[in-house]
Amino acid sequence: MSQDFAHLSVLLAETVDGLNIRADGIYIDGTFGRGGHSREVLSRLGVDGRLIAIDRDPQAIKAAEQFANDSRFQIVHGGFGQLANYVEELGLVGKIDGVLLDLGVSSPQLDDAERGFSFLRDGPLDMRMDNSQGETAAQWLARAEIEDMAWVFKTYGEERNARHIARCIAADREKTPFTRTKQLADLIARVAKSKERNKHPATRVFQAIRIYINSELEQIDQALEGALKVLAPHGRLSIISFHSLEDRIVKRFIRRHSQGEELPHGLPVTEAQLNKSRTLMPVGKAMKPSDVEIEQNARARSSVLRVAERLPF
């Protein structure tokens, strides 16, 4: 049994501030984790408020037992990409006042060697957010073609040595299958042609495999579209990203829906037509953690918070 690992929620106050909490509102925490953001949301809700939390990690579902006696709270075991489906089942489409997403892997997942996310701790090569189902990283590495591995490393890890590393993995697995995180990390450290200062050579490959195994970017796309569908007028989106691939998706989504559809040039357009084509309004600028927060929690360094509001048109 894995021990319980602590988790410091990044940009905690700022993210919940972004939701502009109403005491009687209905909110979604799409990435419950260990409940840091949920706890803060609940502290700002009144007796008639409601919080629906979602997580696909069985350990997160167990952690949600801390709120078992709070009638305002409920937890759903599943991926945040399906949030629109869960809301539809509850009959709450168009009634959600805010959606919070804290993307990427959590500290407890990284710190628990048995989960297989970290190249700094030796453990089984798993990397599944929901370790009760799906293909493990070890299983994928055992069957993937060189071209497929190279594509994943390049696309999801922006790894410059993607093809070379893929070839080396394919050659080594003929002798010994990759089953441990240290085994893979040591190989990458040995064969990487170029190394980045203050970054372990395996960082990008581990990120890439994790994103691929968990379909993380597809989940983000689905969650954003789903959030837009379920938000009430003036409902808020408050989203924390941890690397450029995540943030790019969020930034482009907000930009696309705040600029609206492209309308014919040279033809008269009514204000109603302009408004109808816009569904979101950015709230403030992208926010990064303070130096104080980074000093207290080094993993906050790369985080970016973006907030947007559902327009009432």
Swiss-Prot record:
The places in or outside the cell where this protein is found are: Cytoplasm
Instruction: Provide the alphabetized UniProt keywords.
Output: Cytoplasm, Methyltransferase, rRNA processing, S-adenosyl-L-methionine, Transferase
Which EC number applies?
Answer: 2.1.1.199
Q: Do the record's keywords include Iron? A: no
InterPro entries, sorted:
RsmH, SAM-dep_MeTrfase_MraW_recog, SAM-dependent_MTases_sf
Q: Which top-level group of life is the source organism from?
A: Bacteria
One GO molecular-function entry? rRNA (cytosine-N4-)-methyltransferase activity
**Record-linked Pfam families:** Methyltransf_5
Q: Which reaction does it catalyse?
A: cytidine(1402) in 16S rRNA + S-adenosyl-L-methionine = N(4)-methylcytidine(1402) in 16S rRNA + S-adenosyl-L-homocysteine + H(+)
Residues annotated as binding S-adenosyl-L-methionine: G35, G36, H37, D55, F80, D102, Q109
A cellular component term, taken from the record's GO annotations: cytoplasm
Q: List the disulfide bonds.
A: none
Please give the biological process terms from Gene Ontology that the record holds: rRNA base methylation
Protein family membership: Belongs to the methyltransferase superfamily. RsmH family.
What is its biological role? Specifically methylates the N4 position of cytidine in position 1402 (C1402) of 16S rRNA.
Its recorded name reads: Ribosomal RNA small subunit methyltransferase H
Source organism: Shewanella amazonensis (strain ATCC BAA-1098 / SB2B)
Q: What is the lineage of its organism?
A: Bacteria, Pseudomonadati, Pseudomonadota, Gammaproteobacteria, Alteromonadales
